[in-house]
Curated annotation (Swiss-Prot):
CDD domains: RuBisCO_large_II (cd08211)
GO molecular function: magnesium ion binding; monooxygenase activity; ribulose-bisphosphate carboxylase activity
The enzyme's E.C. designation: 4.1.1.39
Gene source species: Rhodobacter capsulatus (strain ATCC BAA-309 / NBRC 16581 / SB1003)
Protein name (record): Ribulose bisphosphate carboxylase
Gene: cbbM
Taxonomic classification: Bacteria, Pseudomonadati, Pseudomonadota, Alphaproteobacteria, Rhodobacterales
One biological process term in Gene Ontology: reductive pentose-phosphate cycle
Cofactor(s), by name: Mg(2+)
Amino acid sequence: MDQSNRYARLDLKEADLIAGGRHVLCAYVMKPKAGYGYLETAAHFAAESSTGTNVEVSTTDDFTRGVDALVYEIDPEKEIMKIAYPVELFDRNIIDGRAMLCSFLTLTIGNNQGMGDVEYAKMHEFYVPPCYLRLFDGPSMNIADMWRVLGRPVVDGGMVVGTIIKPKLGLRPKPFADACYEFWLGGDFIKNDEPQGNQTFAPLKETIRLVADAMKRAQDETGEAKLFSANITADDHYEMVARGEYILETFGENADHVAFLVDGYVTGPAAITTARRQFPRQFLHYHRAGHGAVTSPQSMRGYTAFVLSKMSRLQGASGIHTGTMGYGKMEGDASDKIMAYMLTDEAAQGPFYHQDWLGMKATTPIISGGMNALRLPGFFDNLGHSNVIQTSGGGAFGHLDGGTAGAKSLRQSCDAWKAGVDLVTYAKSHRELARAFESFPNDADKLYPGWRVALGVN
């Protein structure tokens, strides 16, 4: 059934929809299956996403028609489809009237993903009007709060030097805590890897006790504050809260040095909101493990990593992993920097829409995946600043002289970039950085030809 007479209004102007302030706008790349028209399929998509189905129903009234989602722009050659969703469509909490991201996803990326006339459809961006944006929690903490704990300026405090304890599974509690202590002697921040939790060989309570002690010892040794991101991911709300409360109690006076990591993609918006609301004084670390199943450029359905990141700020993530923008081992390229800008800036331009965040706190980009001291300068050149949390697993513990030296090499690399000094030149007077060249010779040969002669390495 062709529903374009009801669910398509190509006379509507995007600027007018934004000025009106009552529509969420979504931009998709959509291709109909063979034999279906573009506008016809787009209208069916909008109907299925809002007030319609595949037939007209007798219960529809004038009010219902007033909240139809409407296709307002199409470009069949580029496969671009834009839909305007009235804000009234989205579910709100009965306890406080707040917005819920699961409702946004249910409508904009729900049943429409399985429609028989759609070859593929992927959301590439969305715009949130002020009246709807104000209903989301947004972050309560971000990198500025970490800088404060670390004793740095709360504006432009610079890179937080971090790691992921490797191997990601298989370490008993004491070796895990020992690795934390080793890194903290040179670095700032350690995160649980996403599967680390309460395995039988590493009970959470025993591990956390030893990590809290390692933090105290490292702080005493260095005279510097240290940070730990503890995984509280669970299926059950009460389990997440129990883990969080135990961790804070165990760290005691260092409770404000603790972030909570949640695997936000695999557990969904409910887990992120649980952590955000139950622990508003902790940095909420959104890990996105599994997201590539829908966000990868190879996937033609779902939504992009840009969309995932933008949603995370609405939900209240203090920080989210944003990949390495083509400078590490993960999928991505240099243009991904717009993802970071959308997370951190008061207003930012995305692929399709300009978003004003109306004072909502920024979400911090967390950089991880194959990074080391040699790759950081190129990454910072592309991004334009170093105000990120950077977590290197192999880039720290793959250093020939161990985790402490690896941490120091990462910091030295950032210092060199901020000073505008060539990395090879800086390495001549900084041993840990110089040894990073020997630790990662393939990267060194590719990125810094002639380094062996300059550093006197055979």
